[in-house]
Amino acid sequence: MVAMARWPWRVLLPLLLLHSSPVFFVFAQEGQDNDPSTLFKRALEMMNLRKYDGSLGLLNAVLEVEPNHSEAYRQRASVLRHKCRYKEAEGDYSKYLELKPGSSSVEKELSQLLQAQNALESAYGQFESHDFSKVLDYINKIVLVFSPDCLKAKLLKAKALLALKDYSTVISETGFILKEDEDNLDALLLRGRAYYYLADHDVASRHYQKGLRLDPEHSELKKAYFGLKNLVKKTKSAEDNAAKGKLRVSAEDYKASLAMDPDHTSYNVHLYLGLCKVLVKLGRGKEAISSCTEALNIDGELVDALTQRGEAKLLTEDWEGAVQDLKEAAQKSPQDMGIREALMRAEKQLKLSKRKDWYKILGISKTASAAEIKRAYKKLALQWHPDKNVDKREEAENMFREIAAAYEVLGDEDKRVRYDRGEDLDEMNMGGGGGGGFNPFGGGGQQYTFHYDGGFHGGGGFPGGGFPGGFQFNFG
């Protein structure tokens, strides 16, 4: 090692950048060109290059040879302050003031040191209180101003940025740290987490793995790595089961995946969508709506989630909601014929929901036979004949009109088939009031012919009083 003292400076300098041990410099200083003044000068050059570790080693070497070198104490204090080794820096400033009392500039530097030290302590306190914005204020505005090479502050800053979900900046900040020290485990962990929360799982995994190669028992790296591995495995199981048609198992897998990390929104958006699709296929519309809504809360531009929620609303017979979602999806993706087809179905169902339910008016099921339809019509026509309801004639006329219109459609097999298919019929009153609906008591309009074998008995109302059996009457 003594031979090292004979090495030229161009060879020695790179080694100085890597070592700060006083022992190293004891050997180095034996060279004829490595006297304290030369080492001190080179230390200042290193400081100007922001090579603080190298300059610290040189200053240590100076003070080994010349313990009362006041400027070496001052400059070493400055380097230590830069690296936020505040207690050591304070000792060096105090030593300088012993050697040269009354230096206002050094007293100012000491004051800045104490200010940075207090700010770093406050930043840690704010981090524990989860006030991450204040953490950044203390670090950026004070600590890193006076201690620009403070690794603790840089790591705390990265943690605060991670908590604030500023993942891109975390990647940038930890990148600077790893450029100086590629094996920094804290930086590898933080950078891996940032990539993880950006859903770049492959890159995240590589960071975790590198850290674990350096320290296989690092608890946080192990937790992050195996947590990611389990998440990917469970997600794949959900997707595989969905592809195989094992929909109930797939739904449970998706739910289990979502429970692993509720804060992983950039990834969970796809899990919510996958779950929604499976629930739609299972016919569980209400649950599907909830899952797709969660996806849209994360990414409101996710067309697939809008489409699937529209399909889910069709299952719950929320026709208007389905049309709204599918129309928005169609606007965002106008070339998608699948969305257009779904929108047409939703619009048809909405239209059908607003038309008259002739079966309900006659009080019969949709599977009623022609004979049952006729019997129901006869019964209701007698019940609501206006001449039999003089005290509530207006209500009776309205009901009789509805009954007549219902029978006009359901009593005709062709019209009934078309009605059941959801087709529009000009002859039908599709509901909503107004227009050319059937009105047997008004002038003009449509003409309906009713055949009734039993006859209306009793007088009043219509011309001729009661009607004999086998009669025919027209409303024009």
From Swiss-Prot:
It is found in: Endoplasmic reticulum lumen. Pfam families: DnaJ, TPR_16. Keywords: Chaperone, Endoplasmic reticulum, Repeat, Signal, TPR repeat. Residues 357-423 form the J domain. Residues 1-28 form the signal peptide. PROSITE patterns: DNAJ_1, DNAJ_2, TPR, TPR_REGION. GO terms for cellular component: endoplasmic reticulum lumen. May play a role in protein folding in the endoplasmic reticulum. Interacts with BIP1. This is DnaJ protein P58IPK homolog A. It comes from Oryza sativa subsp. japonica (Rice).
